[in-house]
């Protein structure tokens, strides 16, 4: 009796059909064609950025890449003669196969990409690219003198670099450390390590000496991050905080100036960045500080008009769109703003104090 046929079933690894109706026909033909044609390139760039930022689905790929890099650099003499040609051949074949299968799958007529997929991929790629260039945004805020100090410091300590590379470190060890640091720069544990090292005053002093840039060398006992909107000064054992609140009014026909504003614009009483609002000055509440136990107390009895904001009664007048500020009122001015100020004392207490 013949044995029955044995069949093995494998999971279907093809990209599933989109359950959402394609919206390519709802777009202009030129934009649709451009997005559909460029989608494979966008998808591949998104995969590369995901690998560099450690935001891919399989983080073990990054560890494998780091392990291969360490092996190649550490055993370069052996690898260059024996394993390197095989690694190059296998890597090239794997890359070409991945590119071909990815492009064929994305351009498949049975499951074409939808506008939602293309836009989501573009948004992910933009976010990951912004995450990569975020460490370099610090250099955009430097002045001309900062760039001069940086260049002068790097040139001045160049002999130290040369001495370290020739006497203590080797080129192989430098490539090993630099390559691993670059490949793991955006990993979560690398970011956490840099944040912990940045808390050290010694590290900041070393960076100040080697780069010529000015870094904050003072560690505060408490981070009053919720008070960034207000002016803070140290007084005794506490901190004096000067709160600045903007009063916004609109002129209505037959009513005059009123705190009643349009629903889509700013509130009647807001912070200077317009992020927080209150109905009146009496409804203002102290910010909550979660970093330590604090006790608030007003230093001023009442709110006062900030004379430095505007002369006269302290109002700055705008047009209907809160633009074109002026110190004088006219028939074309329909909105105005006044700044109030009041000082308070926040005392940082220990956990054991009452």
Curated annotation (Swiss-Prot):
Domain of life: Eukaryota
Compartments where found: Peroxisome membrane; Endoplasmic reticulum membrane
GO-annotated biological processes: peroxisome organization
Outcome of gene disruption: Results in severe peroxisomal defects, caused by reduced peroxisome-endoplasmic reticulum contact sites. Leads to defects in peroxisomal matrix protein import, membrane growth, as well as organelle proliferation, positioning and segregation.
Any Pfam family matching the protein: Pex24p
TM region positions: 24-44, 63-83, 84-104, 151-171, 173-193
Glycan attachment residues as annotated in the record: 319
Keywords: Endoplasmic reticulum, Glycoprotein, Membrane, Peroxisome, Transmembrane, Transmembrane helix
Protein name: Peroxisomal membrane protein PEX32
Source organism: Ogataea parapolymorpha (strain ATCC 26012 / BCRC 20466 / JCM 22074 / NRRL Y-7560 / DL-1)
């Amino acid at each position: 009796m013949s044995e029955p046929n044995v069949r093995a079933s494998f999971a279907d690894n093809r990209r599933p059909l989109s359950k959402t109706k394609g919206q390519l026909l709802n777009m202009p033909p030129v934009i649709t064609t451009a997005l559909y044609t460029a989608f494979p390139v966008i998808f591949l760039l998104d995969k590369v950025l995901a690998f560099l930022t450690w935001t891919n689905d399989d983080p073990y790929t990054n560890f494998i890449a780091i392990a291969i890099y360490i092996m190649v650099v550490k055993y370069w003499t052996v690898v260059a003669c024996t394993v390197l040609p095989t690694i190059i051949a296998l890597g090239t074949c794997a890359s070409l196969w991945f590119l071909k299968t990815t492009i064929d799958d994305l351009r498949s007529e049975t499951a074409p990409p939808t506008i939602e997929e293309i836009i989501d991929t573009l948004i992910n790629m933009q976010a990951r690219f912004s995450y990569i260039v975020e460490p370099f945004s610090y250099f955009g805020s430097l002045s001309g003198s900062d760039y001069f100090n940086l260049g002068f410091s790097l040139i001045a300590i160049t002999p130290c670099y040369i001495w370290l590379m020739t006497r203590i470190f080797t080129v192989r060890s430098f490539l090993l450390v630099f390559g691993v640091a670059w490949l793991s720069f955006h990993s979560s544990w690398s970011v956490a390590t840099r944040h912990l090292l940045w808390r050290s005053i010694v590290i900041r002093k070393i960076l100040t000496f080697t780069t010529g840039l000015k870094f904050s060398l003072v560690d505060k006992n408490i981070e009053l991050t919720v008070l960034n909107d207000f002016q803070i000064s140290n007084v005794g054992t506490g901190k004096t905080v000067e709160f600045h609140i903007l009063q916004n009014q609109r002129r209505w026909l037959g009513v005059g100036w009123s705190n009643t504003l349009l629903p889509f614009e700013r509130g009647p009483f807001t912070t200077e960045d317009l992020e927080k609002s209150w109905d009146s000055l009496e409804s203002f509440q102290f910010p909550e500080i979660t970093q330590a136990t604090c006790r608030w107390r007003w230093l001023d009895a009442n709110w006062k008009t900030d004379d430095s904001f505007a002369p006269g009664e302290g109002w700055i007048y705008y047009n209907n769109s809160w633009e074109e500020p002026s110190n004088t009122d006219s028939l074309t001015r329909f909105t105005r703003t006044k700044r109030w100020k009041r000082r308070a004392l926040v005392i940082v207490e220990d956990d054991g104090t009452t």
